[in-house]
Amino acid sequence: MFVDDNSLIIYSTWPSTLSDSSGRVIIMPDNRSFTFKEGFKLDESIKSILLVNPSSIDLLKIRVYKHRIKWMGDIFVLFEQENIPPPFRLVNDK
């Protein structure tokens, strides 16, 4: 997923699929990245928030905070899961 330079990244586990606006992969957290337990502030310079693997409580907290300070940006949610095949094969029998 491409992340804008004016975005805030809030994560529970760091994803392996983030790229910045120039196309480089963001390997480790940087100065615009926070965990859900850390404190952060939203201001007008931040245009969007990317939430990575949030819990339902984390989503609710961010939504309440956004509404309370009247921040007018976008919120994107990224869920990463391991691709586990089903325990059976799908077969098209004729």
Swiss-Prot record:
The keyword ATP-binding applies. GO terms for cellular component: host cell cytoplasm; virion component. Keywords: ATP-binding, DNA-binding, Helicase, Host cytoplasm, Hydrolase, Late protein, Nucleotide-binding, Phosphoprotein, Transcription, Transcription regulation, Transcription termination, Virion. It is found in: Host cytoplasm; Virion. GO terms for biological process: DNA-templated transcription termination. GO terms for molecular function: ATP binding; DNA binding; helicase activity; hydrolase activity. It comes from the Viruses. Belongs to the orthopoxvirus OPG142 family. Part of a complex composed of the kinase OPG054, OPG092, OPG100, OPG114, OPG115, OPG142 and OPG157. Late protein which is a part of a large complex required for early virion morphogenesis. This complex participates in the formation of virosomes and the incorporation of virosomal contents into nascent immature virions. Required for the stability and kinase activity of OPG054. This is Core protein OPG142. It comes from Monkeypox virus.
